[in-house]
């Protein structure tokens, strides 16, 4: 199957230049690229669809280039509201290096169609202002640039600086450089990048006399129109395990709605049409089993964190519900799993009966409610039912020397860390 047909049935083509011409060109190996500006210390879930596009093309026998925006990251693509914070050169350079280190999970840098990593600071930082204005700026119509939706919205509100206004030119020039240096003839990117990408297509025609292509992927939202990739705490869902734990990552995907899960499986995984059709039947006929959600969470955690982390996360989920031993969890996984709910810290000398712990952890809003939970048999510590109001933990009850997992009823969890 031609890679363009593969992308089409997955619903991954949002906008494109001449798709038939690209399909014909992609019948033999092409070179393509996607750029990522280091606007933070890690890639996040929103980067995955365009990044995985590179992997899909590579698996189909094409040659991907990953561009780290060491120069464009100093400027920032204009957003709908307000100027971006200008980060220091050292910060952007550090972030670019950290992001570069995450890429090997997604594209292969060895073999016949090895991916290439480039940084646009290499050519942008060497360009003088006069050269930029003469060789790049003269090819852009101010009318066209002002017609861009984001620019229009900014001009109607708080305005836009020349710095951000010129971002489009820098990105377009990247495409020209990659075409000159490596014969790159396709840029892929997010749907919000269409204006920048087609500017690069046009600049290649004017400067290099070449016909190149552009494809954007859909912006990922859930069925309610909410932005994809925000964690339960409201922050970004980072690919760095130190910023978003594998447990939190897994939980995000296992909680996908029935309305979203098949679309996410098409866009984020490499499952076949046949496998996806079977899971679609599961969602329609047996949604309570959440088989598609489990498959999505497993595939995504394997992809980003590896199979060992996935196994640890799934063991943690089972242990919280009493289907595996909490003591079998390593401390990092245990802490991450309970931190998704609430964690109470109990210092030396503070009362620590089961009643105190239930109130401190937020599982009971009063001592009276805590006592009722114990009396009704609904209070658990480390999956053991507590039957006495005056129960206190002994040293041997503490997981990894300091942790307790509290549960009220079947599904309400909290962590307690004993500090002294």
UniProtKB/Swiss-Prot annotation:
Briefly state the protein's biological role: Catalyzes the attachment of tyrosine to tRNA(Tyr) in a two-step reaction: tyrosine is first activated by ATP to form Tyr-AMP and then transferred to the acceptor end of tRNA(Tyr).
Protein's cellular compartments: Cytoplasm
| Quaternary structure, from the entry | Homodimer.
The residues the record assigns to binding ATP are 230
- Give a Pfam family name: tRNA-synt_1b
Domain S4 RNA-binding, by residue range, is 352-418
Tell me where on the tree of life, at the top rank, the source sits: Bacteria
Query: A GO CC term?
Result: cytosol
Could you list this entry's UniProt keywords, alphabetically sorted: Aminoacyl-tRNA synthetase, ATP-binding, Cytoplasm, Ligase, Nucleotide-binding, Protein biosynthesis, RNA-binding
Which positions does the motif 'HIGH' region occupy? 38-47
Q: Which family does it belong to?
A: Belongs to the class-I aminoacyl-tRNA synthetase family. TyrS type 1 subfamily.
Q: What is this protein called?
A: Tyrosine--tRNA ligase
